[in-house]
């Protein structure tokens, strides 16, 4: 039995010798490599925080002291040390979450996964502790240097630093990267600190001596106070020359570090000093992403930030590769467009490769900007670039657009800025769970005046719609697509005058017009499957892909008027989604055909594969067909009234089975 097998809670760590702790760290790394290689997950970040996490749990008393992990994917070691070792279910349906989860353990405080929020959580928790008489309890926020490029983190620091009584310890996990190398002025500032690992300033004797002289001089009358101010100013100048941590201390935060984040004793010493200070402290820990695993360290792109199923010895993927992904199609096309148009620029929020801007950057490095984890800044900066005659393409994960809604509305749309926003990982994404599903975007952008929204169904349509998007110079455009591989090409029977594609009429040549199926983006294969199943029940259908969901095309409304039922199949929330918008436009045009919004419920959806999540919420061909047949054959659907200028409705009669 290994030492890891004996760990059931953090208190067990206090029983271990220095040698046993070193052995435990090795066992944790071996465990993570062996298990995450079989399930996929965030391997590199967790290999980099083994000793750091052990030190936090040895010095502080979880769950009495609250530990908040920013972004949350660096919490695997925390899970192991709090008694969760069944990693065979990691990120699997019904299994362990890849992020902190309150339902799993009392040691998980925040179900975090969006960056830069941990310090605001720490601020709020510590304020509550003060007001409820628990001010002696600590809040520890573990935050990466990448997350500190987000403005929200600095808003929190501004508030935390204002009250010297609150017991907040901010552990900066500085590995020089978020997904890729951290960029920007703050990254340069941290880089200036890295060579100056300073054990002397973290020594208790140093702090005690300073406190003694401070009290003596400040109580020594005008001369003593003058002497204190003079010595304090001189000390600050020397500190900033020797180890320029002045920015933190100028904000009113005690700074300790940099500390070797892979030296357990050094980390424990720094954290003990921070704990004894009993006020807001920053502990700056330097770590390596993928530490102790050669394949990760050799992987220059992201040091195994997130992996699929790999060979644990070599790090080579074992899953069949080579299929074309949505991201790779975008990457090729935007690079080609950039070759043709010098006004095209790219913007990413610390995810150059994941969102597919790397090929563009390789060809035109001066025209691609990584702004760090700063989606709000990205959108307003893009508006400014558009004002200056450029056409920015902002590529982000769909779930991260949520943070920049105000900038989209007030800075981009209000000013009619020609900005294209490309949303990767739209819809149900799967293993990363509730916070990473890109299911809110279509409902969110419905209320943005003038915005154009496209959802391509296949690779050809992605290339086509991306080019159409960057041709629009007087309004924001959004192009959204799914995670993973692109499906087969879905050719249209015809394209209507306003750009709507008719994908199927079943039965072919039928004069019956029972059901109009509006397929949104990658749901086209599902929509065609539903159409086939309805045909087997004697129910006729027409399947259309609007291509551009906003503004709603007039041909969709005209087709709706000629059918007895409309169903809109989308992989976003039903409330306020595409179907809801089509219904509103139908009513405005005097068309009262019944419409079913077939999409996602307004719920936080747990992790699982995309297929598992869709089945869980009823977005399957079988369930949709069952519901439609019940409506149509149950004669619950009213005939539509004729369009203006027509005497009779043109809907067909009910099939007799």
UniProtKB/Swiss-Prot annotation:
Its cofactor is Mg(2+); thiamine diphosphate. InterPro entries: Dxylulose-5-P_synthase, THDP-binding, Transketo_C/PFOR_II, Transketolase-like_Pyr-bd, Transketolase_BS, Transketolase_C. Pfam families: DXP_synthase_N (PF13292), Transket_pyr (PF02779), Transketolase_C (PF02780). Residues 91-110 are annotated as: Disordered. Residues 101-110 have a biased composition (Basic and acidic residues). Mg(2+) binds at residues 145, 175. Pathway: Metabolic intermediate biosynthesis; 1-deoxy-D-xylulose 5-phosphate biosynthesis; 1-deoxy-D-xylulose 5-phosphate from D-glyceraldehyde 3-phosphate and pyruvate: step 1/1. It is an enzyme of class 2 (transferase). GO terms for biological process: 1-deoxy-D-xylulose 5-phosphate biosynthetic process; isopentenyl diphosphate biosynthetic process, methylerythritol 4-phosphate pathway; terpenoid biosynthetic process; thiamine biosynthetic process. Binds 1 Mg(2+) ion per subunit. Its EC number is 2.2.1.7. Thiamine diphosphate binds at residues 73, 113-115, 146-147, 175, 293, 375. Transmembrane segments: none annotated. Keywords: Isoprene biosynthesis, Magnesium, Metal-binding, Thiamine biosynthesis, Thiamine pyrophosphate, Transferase. CDD domains: TPP_DXS (cd02007), TPP_PYR_DXS_TK_like (cd07033). It comes from the Bacteria. One of its GO terms (molecular function) is 1-deoxy-D-xylulose-5-phosphate synthase activity. It catalyses: D-glyceraldehyde 3-phosphate + pyruvate + H(+) = 1-deoxy-D-xylulose 5-phosphate + CO2. GO terms for cellular component: cytosol. Homodimer. Belongs to the transketolase family. DXPS subfamily. PANTHER family: 1-D-DEOXYXYLULOSE 5-PHOSPHATE SYNTHASE-RELATED, 1-DEOXY-D-XYLULOSE-5-PHOSPHATE SYNTHASE, CHLOROPLASTIC. Catalyzes the acyloin condensation reaction between C atoms 2 and 3 of pyruvate and glyceraldehyde 3-phosphate to yield 1-deoxy-D-xylulose-5-phosphate (DXP). This is 1-deoxy-D-xylulose-5-phosphate synthase. The lineage of its organism: Bacteria, Bacillati, Actinomycetota, Actinomycetes, Micrococcales.
